[in-house]
UniProtKB/Swiss-Prot annotation:
Cofactor(s) the record lists: a divalent metal cation
Annotated protein name in UniProt: Probable metallophosphoesterase MJ0623
GO molecular function, one term: metal ion binding
Cofactor: binding comment: Binds 2 divalent metal ions per subunit.
Annotated source species: Methanocaldococcus jannaschii (strain ATCC 43067 / DSM 2661 / JAL-1 / JCM 10045 / NBRC 100440)
Residues at which a divalent metal cation 2 binds: D70, N92, H115, H144
């Protein structure tokens, strides 16, 4: 949704969900495209000292930011909130009061957000797909592995933005989503 192309509303059901339950947030887009920044495993300040400036540059034009957990410090969420609305879930390293799961509904697309630490072996795509089916979502976004992927796993799109600070592959990364009638995902490498 860029430059007055439309308006959007947000409705949240469920109040404060039990940590095992999913919060449910609904977005309505009228006449435009919604841009979403996706980030995970920032690990400030336990493993990294700062978020690269390139993350803020890439997210400067988004309507919403999703953080898939292992935030580890509330300050990063506050910094991201200066750019856009933020939806975040709790990771295995977080002590913040965040839900374990979130379901976003953007027009007719249901997006599940989890950290992914409940999936073993770590990042197993089949188990992620089954979890997405259980949540009733079209797209499941997770973190935890610090390794990015975009995988159209039969009937569920599986996404992981990797980590912009402590990757487990050579690539530091985030992700951007564009949602209109369909969802398109793009992996964004983060340069130092």
């Amino acid at each position: 949704m860029r430059d007055g192309e439309g308006i959007w509303g947000r409705g949240r059901t469920g109040g404060h969900a039990h940590p095992k339950e999913a919060m449910h947030t609904t977005f309505f887009i009228l006449g435009g495209t919604m841009l979403i920044g996706v980030i995970s495993d920032t690990h400030l300040y336990d493993r990294a000292f700062e978020l690269p400036k390139a993350v803020f540059d890439e997210f400067s034009n988004v309507d919403l930011i999703i953080h898939c957990g292992d935030v580890t410090d509330k300050e990063i969420l506050d910094s991201l909130k200066d750019l856009a609305k933020v939806v975040a879930v709790k990771g295995n390293m977080d002590y913040l009061n965040l839900p374990r799961k979130e379901i976003l509904e953007i027009n007719d697309i249901k997006i599940g957000v989890i950290h992914g630490d409940v999936v073993y072996p770590r990042g197993d795509r089949l188990k992620l797909r089954l979890l997405g089916k259980e949540m009733g979502v079209d797209v499941l976004i997770s973190g935890h592995t610090h390794t990015p992927f975009i995988d159209d796993c039969r009937d569920i799109l599986l996404l992981n933005p990797g980590s912009p600070t402590v990757p487990r592959c050579p690539l530091k990364s985030i992700m951007k989503l564009s949602v209109e009638d369909k969802l398109e995902a793009k992996l964004i490498p983060i340069e130092e």
